[in-house]
Amino acid sequence: MSKLKIDGKEITARRGETVLEVCQREGIYIPTLCYQKNLTPYGGCRLCIVEVKGWSMPAASCTLPVEDGMVIKTNTPKLKKLRKFSLQLILSEHPHSCLICEKEEECAQYQECIQKSAITFGCKFCSQNNNCELQKLVSYFGVREIPFIFNYRHLGIERFDPFFDRDYNICILCGRCVRVCGEIRGAHVLDFHHRGPDTLVGTSFDLPHLETGCQFCGACVDVCPTGALHQRYGKWEGEVQKSVTSTCILCSIGCSIKLNVCNNKVVSSTPNNNQICVRGRFGIAPLIHHPKRITAPMIKRNGRMVQVSWEEALNCAVSKFNEHRGKIGILFSNQLTTEAIDSTYNFANNLKCNNITASLEMKNNFKPYDCKKIKGDSVFIFINTNMIENYSPLFLKLKSKRNVNLVVIDSLKNRFSEVADFWLRPKPGKEIDVLKLLFARKKMSNTTGVSYNTIKLTTRLLSGKKTYLFCNPNNIDNIHVPKRVRLIPLYSQINALKILNAGVGCSLADLLNNNKIDCLYLIGSAPKLSRDYKTIIVQDNFPPLFEFDVFLPTATFTETKGTYINIEGKKKILQKAIDPPGKSKPDDWIIAEMSKILKFGMNPSKQKYRKIVRRGALKKRSLTRKYPHFLIVRENCYSYRGLILSLVMKGFKRLKYDNYIWIAPDVAKKLNIKNGMELKIQGQNIDITMPAYISDTVPENCVFAYSHLSMGINTSQPVRLERAEEGRKKE
């Protein structure tokens, strides 16, 4: 502990603290611009300078460690003058006409008609107006003139990447984006280019972010103090009127987020003192306000879907249920609230319907694990799981543990395999055999495609260290590990553990292949249907690809209250941020209203459904002359209520390519396949057509696809490829 005096106040500071940190803790205000909590101090803006007794020059408090006996002054006339001078220097390369204008308040009424200008000349042209740290500092220092010639950089605005724009004409070179990208996210996409007055922030060789490994997490946007980096969606919606703390449900982690609202519209979603991923940062607002969303009840009348009142729609649905009693199938999404899931189970029980299951078919049942209990000095093994793409917030927490090693077992090459200490690339379907070799007590034959030397080196790494094995249970079958290895399941969707504990009446395949079912009730799910049904009732936000008889529009997770169970078995709270648009209603409200009409009680269901148990290994299918290529299928974690995000948002389409069949270069060369060509993929239980995307991430003689419930893609298997009659170039 150190004792020092700041502005005449005796203060005790902890060892390693900086003067700025001590002042912030004690409530002593020091202006900053380049400083950001949890990032390495930069000392670039010089606004946080302080005077230290005995020192000839002021020092930047953000980089100044405390020392015993220090006497510091933070607010002298000399410091005020120097800070104001530094701010004026910064403003000499930043459009400042509005910042120093005496009539700035008078022109506020004209802001809306000029703010969408292509070039930002002043605050009224900037999307960050009234939310800019520079504006606050100019007001604090009372800056009314800039004694330097204005230097405008004349840089083009970068709009060629998805999700956010970059206008480096208003960048102040604070370095926050560079540091957060490297230090917190570990992506190292951004850095400073050139020197002196030519210094700029950018990517290596000025490549687009899509080509540099950018995670599009938005961390750089969140720390930017000006409008240099700004989210594209909602950019001109206006100032945020309220921020509601809630939970992101677009994956199983359940990150805490802030839903920022303006005029009953979510304009953005931002982290709540944590890190989130591209789905939570840029996927929520455009998804829930998408123009294709249906917000009014509809029924089929004379072969056409027409809008009706809730009373008519509910009565129509109830009449269908009564008509098909005993022949009803219910398929619901894991992404319903736990309250809506309970209501669904109770509704099925009252209907005496045992044909009920969840859209995410969980093939293995493992116990949850609190990731806070994971210790350092360990080895983390990840099998068939891309943590950077699918679980980046969790991966950042794991990576922060002290002295850990990463081992990736995956036949696919990706960003995550490239950052691992060891990447074991087996033949597709041989991942379990690699695990057996790693933990074998005696020598075994090796047919995995991974060299004995790599196995040996990895085994040495595991020796004497605590080992954790992470896997998505739906990407691997029949997994067994020694007792000393802790297996941690990474289910892709929230509430997976809720479904596992509650059980289901049947499997997804049994439900869809049951010819006795005449009425299908789909709650947030739209699978590929292999046959016709007499009645299909859809309860969702978006219409399915097939015809239906009744549509009941539901509220999204931003428009209702509730709870969810995350990947660790913890309850996550959902808060209502906005009112549902149109006539949309929460799922549990819809089910409750139909139960009233049917005179059902709403007491908890006593029906006991079968627990989901581990399934045995799939029968291995060898390549044949008829099916010469192996299709690798991995679960698509970028979906909401069965809807693939790339189908409704262009940014995700450019980022994921999950509506393409990925082709290994050797297969493309052999079959003369070009990017964008329509290919027919046929196997024992698959027959689809998709455009081609050639990628070296796919191993030889293989193709790869993300799982698609709506297309029936869910199992890795041997396939054959045929070029469709018409081809089109990849967008």
Stretches found by the model and what they are:
Residues M1-E17, E21-Q24, Q36, E51-G54, ...:
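N-terminal export/assembly segments and adjacent metallocofactor-ligating motifs
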Residues I30, Y35-Q36, Y345, Y369, ...:
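A cross-kingdom feature strongest in bacterial/archaeal respiratory oxidoreductases
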Residues Y35-Y42, L64-P65, R195, N675, ...:
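Short, glycine-/polar-rich solvent-exposed loops and beta-turns at beta-strand/coil boundaries
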Residues T40-G44, V50-W55:
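Short acidic beta-strand-loop surface patches of small beta-rich interaction domains
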Residues E104, C353-K363, L406-L412, K483-K498, ...:
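A generic structural motif
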Residues I432-F470:
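Phosphate/pyrophosphate-binding active-site segments
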